[in-house]
């Protein structure tokens, strides 16, 4: 039976949704035969993964004026490679791959590109940049959408350039624009890249629960363990002795899970035409915004069958090479417990071949003395790699998040054990507190809502004798509602390494 804890458990777990009757309480909580403890055992191994709260609350929150879509701009780099369409000799004949060298004796010839990107007087280079530099001789002549440039070889090369270096697809970039010392004229130009406008939608969620009015003072024969949040943010273990305490806690706990799931895993329900395809009971469109994972996965995503440290290093260099300073290359990688073990084993493989690597017990404390009845000189041994320093200032630090190991939401199992999602690695450039790259969004003045409908008695608040009854039934309904959003400013600064078994 699912959720059965071996032969010592007398009954399986009982589950129900919605209104709780006296029969539920009597069957589950009220009957109290002799027990070893008056507290229920918290079963961490089944059905409830940990909340995403600690993960999402590590991001700052930014306020917006209203509930309209929120927009932001991502500006790309103006440094680009332009692929060659074709080359033509000085007579205008297309240069074939088996043709003789072109530009012999600094004779001019023509390069054709798909857009007008280069300027008069600039030196441009192809794949073999320093070997064959070319100088632009005048502005481009447009042929439809193609730009034709007259060029000559730059430098002391009089032998020309091999035709194989002038074939379609060779990529060219700008070097500089040299001029003579005296009486020089204008050359060169400046290029710009327009920002790409990004947008996301707010997600509004609700939850409700109905309780009979007579549950107001229902006590439990045994306490229900729960975790309570203090105003300081600290979590403490507590025990609910009244049924309504437990109901209130479950409402908040499950609504909190709604919120976190929407911000982390939410998917936009807008199609390519900007239309929303889902409608609520009112007939109005339901709008859901993209969560963190959907926003990051549009950028850099790699699926892997075999994990290696080189795979991870390659991913990190993609994010940092020529983009981040050497002292700004600390990456925090979110993963599960299985991913952390896999990371440790791969680092261990790498360092095990280092001849200078010595387990100096004075500094690493790999072996320590412990107390044990088994031996008078008992020792403990072990270590785990949680950080790796790669070349060029790249540092990798692991952060294990419990929701990667959640067996309820993550249903696909991995051949090596555990859920497959636990082997996922999310490399996120978080940014700074002044300019975060990932943050939660909030509408100014629009806090979460909590309201009640009730008849004669309201067991949620303890009120009795309602002179303005919402309905004649002796019950109460709690409603919770919130509008949420999350923003990843620049998804290209993030990367995900995902087990291939999770590829859809």
UniProtKB/Swiss-Prot annotation:
InterPro entries reported in the protein's UniProt record: Crass_capsid
Subcellular location(s) per record: Virion
A GO CC term attached to the entry: viral capsid
Keyword Nucleotide-binding in record: no
Pfam families named in the record: Crass_capsid
Keywords in alphabetical order: Capsid protein, Virion
Domain of life from the UniProt record: Viruses
Chief location category: virion
Subunit structure: Interacts with the auxiliary capsid protein (via FD region). Interacts with the head fiber dimeric protein. Interacts with the head fiber trimeric protein. Interacts with the portal vertex auxiliary protein.
Function: Capsid protein self-assembles to form an icosahedral capsid, with a T=9 symmetry, about 77 nm in diameter. Each asymmetric capsid nonamer is covered by 9 capsid auxiliary protein, 1 copy of the trimeric head fiber protein and 2 copies of the dimeric head fiber protein.
Extra information: Displays an HK-97-like fold with an insertion domain that protrudes at the capsid surface.
Name of this protein: Major capsid protein
